[in-house]
Amino acid sequence: KKELRQYFSSMIGFVFLAFFLVIIGIYTWAYNLSGGIGNFEETLGSISFLFVILIPILTMRIVAEENHQKTNQLLYTAPVSITKIILGKFFAVVSLFGIGILVICLYPLILNMYGTDVRLSLAYSSIIGFFLLGTACIAIGMFISSLTESQVIASVVSFITLLLTFLLSNITGMLPTEAISQCVMIAVLWLVICLVFYHMMNNVTVLVMMAVIGEAAIWIIYAVKSSLYESLLTNILNTLALSTRFDDFSLGILNYDAIVYY
């Protein structure tokens, strides 16, 4: 309740909803009403890039502000578990996002009223996928916000992370698939992961152990069976791509794998 109240007392909530709905309204008018096309799912697919811009703004202060003001120490000693506190913050952001989604649910009905033939099953399946995609982006933004005390850093890193996530399917197509290239990229990625854990735990011993054991395992596996690395990172990144899983929802397919993934 506190987090949700702060969104509307600081105008962030109103600005988010206004910008979110105005952009969707413009796309709906241009594509569905003016164009006379009933594929509302394609409209949602076209504006999913909004998450890259809007979600970092919503989540940048959600945990970073607590870290900056040192009020996170009070949260640790509260009678409520940390899990419940984080879930409370998460559901506060999701509730704000959900208000916008509820408004969007009216769009297919309005389009039908104005003579645009909308396939409601596809439209509402896409809305479900759009909502789940948004909640996944919110979770990423919250995690990044928890790693820093600076709202600006949280916002910028969230923006870059979400942008890369949305571009993963394009990026993987440009990566070399040879075993040695994939192995080197995995080794570098592991070092980045170790640095993230170090930032969270601030423990040099854990950092060194993770880095040494991980790097040793990566190169030993390559020496034993290098063929395992052929296209390995490419396949992993394709699996992690958020936006590609939205495609099934656009086709009216409620893919349980995608639902669980989000």
Model-predicted regions and their roles:
Residues 24-29, 35-41, 50, 92-158, ...:
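Secretory targeting signals
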Residues 31-38, 154-262:
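Terminal transmembrane helical anchor/hairpin motif
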Residues 62-92:
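Helix-loop-helix units of permease transmembrane domains in multi-pass membrane transporters
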Residues 13-14, 85, 153-155, 259:
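Alpha-helical transmembrane segments and their helix-entry boundary regions
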Residues 12-17, 92-99, 182:
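Select subsegments of transmembrane alpha-helices in polytopic membrane proteins
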Residues 2-6, 73-77, 235-238:
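Short amphipathic alpha-helical coupling elements at transmembrane boundaries
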Residues 8, 79, 147-148, 253:
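Helix-loop interface residues and adjacent transmembrane-helix termini in multi-pass membrane transporters
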Residues 1-66, 90, 106, 198-201, ...:
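Hydrophobic alpha-helical transmembrane segments
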